Structure formats: C-alpha cells, structure tokens
Amino acid sequence: GSTGNEGDGTLNGTPYIYIGGTATIGDKNLISNNTTLFGAESGSVFGIGNGRSGYSTIGSSDNSIIIIDDKATINNNVYGGGNYGATGVSSSSNTSYTNIIINDGFIEGSVYGGGNKNGSGSSSKTATVNITMNGGNVVGSIYGGSNEKGTIYGTVNVNINGGEVTNSVYGGGRGGYTNSSNSGTFVRDDINVVIGDSSLNTTPIINKSVYGGSAYGTVNDSSSGNNVSSSKTKVTVNKGIIVNVFGGGEGNNTYTPYVMGDIEVTINNGTITNVFGGNDLKGKPNGNITVTINDGTITNTYGGGNETSANTTNVYLNGGTVDKIFGGSNISGTVTTSNVTASGGTCTTLYGGNNAGGTTGVTNVLVDNGNITTVYGGGEATSVTESTNVTINNKVGTVFGGSNLSGNIPITNIVVNDANINDVYGGNNQGGKVENTNIDINGTLITNVYGGGLKAETTTTNVNLNYGLITNVYGGGNEAGAITTNVNLGGANIINVFGGSNTSGEVKTTNIKNLSVTTSDLSSAFTI
C-alpha cells in the first residue's frame, strides 16, 4: 500500500489490537534517532494501516479498536487511525467508530483518537471516536482528534476515569493551520470530555490542563470561520485532581484554535486550580459560554479565557467552594457580556468583570443564595466599558458596584432586595473611577451605604433608600470624594444620613430628598 493507489490495502472489517502483559512496543534508540519505516514513526501503535501520503483510503479499515492493559509499555504514541490512512473512509456503512481503551500500562508518548496525518470518516460517513482511560499512565497528552492534520467527521468522546496524564487532555486534535496543504486538525461535530466517574473508586490526575477544544486546530466544524455551529463542546468534571480546565482550545503565538459552537463546562466535583470557560492563549470561541459549578474545590473560576476574549459568558455557582469567580477573562481579552449567578456554594470574592487585564462590556451579577463574602460588579484591576449591574437577594459581606484595585466604569447599578449586608459601595474599591453610580435599597439590613467608592473617586452618585433598616448612609464615598451626590430617603428606616463622604473626600454638591429641611452643606449629617 505504501506505493499503491487509492483503494489499495483497504480492510473491510475491524482490526482489534490488544497489548497487555509485559509487552514493550518500540526501541528507544530507534525512536530517539527518529527512525521511520515507509513514513511511519518507530515505537507507535496504529489502529489501521500505514497508508500513503495524499491517499486517504490506502491502509484504511472500517473501524478501529485498541486496548492497552496490564504492564504493557508503549515507547511512543498511540493512534486510533493510521499514519496517512483514514478510518472508515472506504467502509460500505455510513458510520464508523474508533475505540481506544487504556486499562493500565505506560504510554511514553501521546494518544490520538484520529491518525497521525489523517482523520476518520468522510463528509458522507459519520465517525465516532471514543477514548476511555481507566488506569495507567500517559506521559504525553490525550487528543480526541488527529496529530498533524486530519478531520474527524463526527463526534469525539473522551472519558478519563482513572490513571494519570502527565501533560494535558484535549477534546480536539493537535495540529493547526499552516497552509492550504497542511490545514490542521478538525472535529466536525460534538466534543464530550468527561473527567472522573463518581461511581468508581479511582481518581484521575491531570498534571496540566483539560481542554474541550483542540491544541491548535478546529472543533465543531470541518472548516474554520466566524459562523456559529450547532455542535457543542462539553467538558464535565465529576472527580479528579486537575490544574486547569478550559472549555475552549489552547493556542500559541503561531496557531489560533477555533471553537465554532457553544461551550458548556460543568464541575460536579474534584480539586481544580483554575476553571476557564473559554480559550487559553489565543482565539475566541464563536458561540456563548456556560460554566456551572455544582460541587468541588476550585481556586479560580473564569467565565472567559486566560489571555483571550469571549462573547457572552454565563457562570452559575450552585454549590462547592470557590475562592474567586470572574465573569470575564484572566490576563487579557475582551468579554462582551458576562453573567454571574450565585444560587448556593461558597465564594470568597465574586467579580462580574475580568481579573488582571482586558475589559468587559456589560456585567450582570445576581446573588440569590450561598455564602459570598465580597462582590464586585467590575473586575480586579480592569475596566468595564458600558455598565455593571449587581442584584443582591441574600446575605453578603461587602458589595462594590465597581472594580477593586483599578479600572474605569461609566455606570454602576446596584439593587438590594431583603438582604443582610455590612457595606454597600456604588463605586470602586482602591483605585480607578466610576462616572455614575445608582443604588436602590428595597428592604434590607445594612450597616453602611456609600454612594461612592472606598478610596476611589466618583463623579455622580444616586442612592434610593426605598425600604430597610440602615445604620449609616453617605452620599459620597469612604475616604473618597464625588462631584455630586443625590440621596432619596424614601421609606427606609435610617439612623444617620450624610450628604458627603466618610472620613475624607471632597463633595461639591449634595442633594437629599424627603427631608423636612433642604441642605447643600457638605458636612451635614442628619439623624432620623
């Protein structure tokens, strides 16, 4: 077949490869010297034939089954497909499958659901790739797709139930677009990555990252572009010890990964350092992103990506323990709209915006339940370009309409309904500036309400005290000034009302409504 023509060396059947016992595949000297045979690398396992460059049917078979077991050692890579040949492309059936099962053993290289330089199925033959790891060790990474190039014309399912992966797990393939003859890797339909099985005693360990997308290629379509695919990328963690979880792809300075459809990340349990809804280093998913936390222990959760942008992000905290939640991205990237909803669980600090860099357009934060210490409508040290919208229906320690360390915001909106809160600030915390703040208090128990920020300036503040019991109300900020403050006392029960700021900060004009007197005295305080 290596010198044949299209259709030569085709197997109409299903190869079954079992490697167990103490078997060792590959001579390390040949591997280190990059020795090849008819273009195939030494020490690797291929689920079908080698094939020939430029011919997808040579070396093909209908399906592919590979099982790695016992104390077997694979000194290089495992491919569900061939070197050049594509699984199922010559099948008389309109479907094909690839099953890779790792029960135990040691794989020095990586595992690919597709082939080295080709994929599985065709535009008229739907392929399904299943990779299941129950134990053993993979020193490289696990890819649902192909290596250098190739399209999986169907769905990829990656299930890591146990064992240890030294590097990362990808729902898609590795290779990215280089030129027209090297277009990279594609998975046309859905991606389903599941880490851990709560019914089993095994706990998988992923020492680097889990990606729903590819390293550098495309998922949810057989071509890349700006359209939104109906296919989805789903990542579910039921248990496991993982450094990073990404709903999207990886990327680098050379390659941009594409996720063409919507992304869904669901954490049901596990110990995870960072959860990202989007991409890692490059690229923006075409669809929307949903991250749902039901349980587990997580250090940081981001609706967006690491150094990347996103369209609309949705983060739901239903349970578990999370140190910080960001509706936006981490280091950089623009997020159009972020939505964060807390219905349960525990979170120390919840942000509507980005963390260290980039911007968010509109942020929407809703706290209905859970143990939340501090809420920011904005980000940690980032700006919001349109508005922040914070609604509190539960007990919270401190609420800021704006950002923390820095960042500028044109409008912040806070609505508090029947909640118990220590401090409410319309503005930022330690830096940056908010132009206009709006606070509406509707039935609550609050110690302090500040129209402005804490050590952060505000232009205009608007505080509406409709209902509730409040100890102190300041039209301005805390150690921070404002140009104009507007306080409407409404029907709330208030002990002290100050038109200006607390401790320090200049306020040029104050307006307090629904008092028996009218004042413009910046230092005025009223006891009701």
Annotate each language-model stretch with its function.
Residues 1-77, 83-110, 116-141, 147-168, ...:
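Surface-exposed loop/turn motifs in large extracellular/passenger domains
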